[in-house]
Amino acid sequence: MSQGVEFNRLMLDMRAMQMDAMSAPKPVSGAQEAGASSFADMLGQAVNKVAQTQQASSQLANAFEVGKSGIDLTDVMISSQKASVSFQALTQVRNKLVQAYQDIMQMPV
């Protein structure tokens, strides 16, 4: 029986929190926070990070090919796969963005 009482008390507390949240004033969503970065900035950073990963992988592969000491084949392969996966993920994001743009453009006005 005490579980039923605890459950009822929990439900009452949740409803009270819901009412408080609904009655609280909501901030204006049009103004962007000073420290917040835009989607374009975040996308640009992602593209730059993928480019850096590919460049590091290429440099590691070149160092292995010329026989530089301390470079292991497993490190080269892991770096190459990281670059490949990050590029594929970026390509998928691009495809989703293009598809979303096309869907929006095809909407009737």
Swiss-Prot record:
It is found in: Bacterial flagellum basal body. Pfam families: FliE. Its main location: other. GO terms for molecular function: cytoskeletal motor activity; structural molecule activity. Belongs to the FliE family. NCBIfam families: fliE. This is Flagellar hook-basal body complex protein FliE.
